[in-house]
C-alpha cells in the first residue's frame, strides 16, 4: 500500500483538514496502544499514519502562513 499523496491533503477544505488531523491523531493513539500491548498486526500502518499527520500539519501551516501574508496586521 503506497503512502498517501500530499495533493490529496491540499484538496481538503479547512474544516475537513481539521477533522482529518483529529482523526489521524486518534488513530495514532490507538496504534501506539496496540504496539505497547503487542497487538499491532500491521506495523506499516503506524508509518502511514505518521506520514499522513505530517502532510496534514504541513498543509495547515502553509494555509496559516498564506493567510497571514495576505492580510497585513496593523
UniProtKB/Swiss-Prot annotation:
Q: Which GO terms describe its biological process?
A: translation
**Presence of the UniProt keyword Ribosomal protein in the record:** yes
**Classification via PROSITE patterns:** RIBOSOMAL_L29
Q: Which UniProt keywords apply?
A: Ribonucleoprotein, Ribosomal protein
One example GO MF annotation: structural constituent of ribosome
Q: Which domain of life is it from?
A: Bacteria
What name does UniProt use for this protein?
A: Large ribosomal subunit protein uL29
What high-level taxonomic lineage is stated for the organism?
Bacteria, Bacillati, Cyanobacteriota, Cyanophyceae, Nostocales
Amino acid at each position: 500500500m503506497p503512502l498517501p499523496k500530499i495533493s490529496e491533503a491540499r484538496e481538503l477544505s479547512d474544516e475537513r483538514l481539521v477533522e482529518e488531523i483529529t482523526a489521524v491523531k486518534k488513530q495514532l493513539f490507538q496504534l501506539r496502544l496496540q504496539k505497547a500491548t503487542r497487538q499491532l498486526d500491521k506495523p506499516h500502518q503506524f508509518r502511514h499514519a505518521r506520514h499522513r499527520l505530517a502532510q496534514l500539519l504541513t498543509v495547515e501551516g502553509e494555509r496559516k502562513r498564506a493567510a497571514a501574508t495576505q492580510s497585513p496586521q496593523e
